[in-house]
């Protein structure tokens, strides 16, 4: 059955032009920004809010943020007042990588906006992210 199949030589020139000589990844001058407004929650009890914030701290989608925020939530959320919980809730509405870079004080990658410069919650998160105890970071138990 396969005796009559001829071998084919497939060759190409050593020179391949992609995108007709144009750069593969063109530089765009315009910055695309899209912000999805957070859900406005009304009538949420403080216990439900704490539980939601713990969940949102653990399930960010980026491991680095998950580790920092879940550890922070485990340590501090139970003692936060309503105002502190509201501020932490607003912080969690920010993009994951921004929170990570702000927590690690890496402002050259993502500059810190004015609205977070005097945040005591962010300062507490930054102190926690320094990991002065040199603990191995892992997700806290539920």
From Swiss-Prot:
InterPro entries: SDH, SDH_sf, SDHAF2. It is found in: Mitochondrion matrix. Keywords: Chaperone, Mitochondrion. Interacts with the flavoprotein subunit within the SDH catalytic dimer. Plays an essential role in the assembly of succinate dehydrogenase (SDH), an enzyme complex (also referred to as respiratory complex II) that is a component of both the tricarboxylic acid (TCA) cycle and the mitochondrial electron transport chain, and which couples the oxidation of succinate to fumarate with the reduction of ubiquinone (coenzyme Q) to ubiquinol. Required for flavinylation (covalent attachment of FAD) of the flavoprotein subunit of the SDH catalytic dimer. PANTHER family: PROTEIN EMI5 HOMOLOG, MITOCHONDRIAL (PTHR12469), SUCCINATE DEHYDROGENASE ASSEMBLY FACTOR 2, MITOCHONDRIAL (PTHR12469:SF2). This protein may be expected to contain an N-terminal transit peptide but none has been predicted. This is Succinate dehydrogenase assembly factor 2, mitochondrial. The lineage of its organism: Eukaryota, Fungi, Dikarya, Ascomycota, Saccharomycotina.
């Amino acid at each position: 059955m396969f005796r009559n199949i001829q071998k084919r030589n497939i060759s190409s020139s050593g020179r391949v032009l992609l995108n007709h000589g144009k750069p593969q990844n063109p530089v765009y001058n315009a910055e695309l920004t899209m912000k999805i407004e957070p859900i406005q929650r009304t009538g949420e009890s403080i216990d439900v809010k704490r539980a939601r914030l713990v969940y949102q701290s653990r399930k960010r989608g980026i491991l680095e943020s998950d580790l920092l925020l879940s550890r922070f939530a485990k340590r501090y959320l139970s003692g936060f007042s309503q105002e502190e919980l509201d501020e932490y809730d607003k912080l969690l509405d920010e993009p994951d990588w921004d929170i990570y870079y702000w927590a690690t004080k890496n402002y050259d990658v993502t500059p810190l906006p004015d609205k977070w410069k005097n945040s005591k919650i962010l300062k507490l998160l930054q102190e926690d992210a320094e990991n002065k105890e040199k603990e191995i970071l892992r997700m806290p138990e539920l």
